Amino acid sequence: MRATLHVSLGLVFLTVAACSSSSTMVANSCGSSGAAANINATDAKVFSPSTATITHGQSVCWQNNGSSSHTVTSNDNTSFNSSLPSGQIFVHTFPTAGSFPYRCTIHAGMTGTITVN
């Protein structure tokens, strides 16, 4: 009886541990983010593609596929701003229509625009 209790408690612990680790997993690629547009930040110091058009309420996902760190910063410095280390993603939802130019604050000339209808 005691051995059965220990085995049962062990299985419960393993199940909880497995569930808790999977529930803390985050998307590690834009493909699994559900975003309407995916943009790559590259070691060539460009966003590719540099423009995207979405509908308000949709999201854009930026992924750093290179080895250099980047940022994704709206030109007004208030709409969105995130660091983008190598291998990471940043997802932003655009609630309103408009044109949203952005840049990497680390690399001059690394720019793009999101158009939201």
Which positions does each model-derived feature cover?
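Sec-dependent bacterial lipoprotein signal peptides
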Residues: 1-18
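Extracytoplasmic copper-binding redox domains, predominantly the cupredoxin/blue-copper superfamily
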Residues: 14, 19-117
